[in-house]
Amino acid sequence: MKIYEGSILTCDSQDRVCRYLVEDGSRIVYVGDELPAKFASGSRVKLGDRALIPAFGDSHIHFASFATFHAGLNVSDAKSNAEILEMIRSFVPTCADKMVIAFGASPHSVAERKFVTRQELDGVCPDKPLFMIKYDGHTCVVNTKLLDILKEKVQHLRGYHGDTGEMNQEAFFAFSDYVSSSVPPVKLIRNMQLAADHLASKGIGMIHSVSGVGYTMDLDVDMENWFARGLGNGLQMRVYFQTMDVQKAKRRRLPRIGGCFDAALDGCFGSADAALLQPYEAPTTLASCITPTSRWPNSAKRPTGSVCRLRSMPLAMPLSIRPHGR
């Protein structure tokens, strides 16, 4: 039993700040301003100038993807493309995987105000496939080694830019699916454990994982579901199946469905392909729905008693639908 004494921010309906919180066996058993005698024997932690707050919840995370990226190279702190390229150059010799994965690139936070190109990536990583995903998770840049693997499959898809190596829309999803499925299941489970510990260390206590990112037979959905049941660090995990095929979720007895990818309605602002009625970056940025509108309303109505989430990027939040057979 442990007693925390100090500023306890409850975030309850009255927004109370209490003096004591008692934790026993990873459960909160008391919160208040006076410490009951039955808890007096517990060990005390005086917070001093610190405060104790409830854990954060992440309502939309692609956990398998996050676990994969977390195990790779994070370039989000780079201030220039030159710095990104140097980070990759230093990382490649230490990477034992068959593919180099980098995450967090943004043209908005580097001095050049543009993405690195395929040719620049080739200069620092010519011998291994390299997949660098944008901070928004909906655009990537690939080097020639990776492009050559999928070129025949993706060159006619919307969003394909073979000259620069930048992939958007359906071309991006094709590369993302390939990269996801290239990670061995055993390695993915290990990466998931490291990712869960990392989230917990940052104060995140609950995640809604939207799953289904390209694994054969949607193996990542099953692995996340099994992984969630075995978590021992207190992290709560709710799995949403990213699909418009309700039967896939029902066969796995999953009560939740929706997210991005197969359930995405449109693109996102970060990649300037969100579907709006008026242009917002260039005369051609009206974009369009990725999923035909004829599909998603019926899918949302079908699973009576389930929770559906369809992702509309401009809203920056999920549309939570709780059908009741109407």
Range-by-range predicted roles:
Residues 2-4, 9, 13-24, 28-233, ...:
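Divalent metal-binding segments
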Residues 3, 256-261:
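Short amphipathic
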Residues 20-21, 261-263:
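Active-site and channel-lining beta-strand-loop segments
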Residues 250-253:
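Acidic (Asp/Glu)-rich catalytic clusters
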Residues 325:
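Short, well-ordered alpha-helices that flank and scaffold nucleotide-derived cofactor binding pockets
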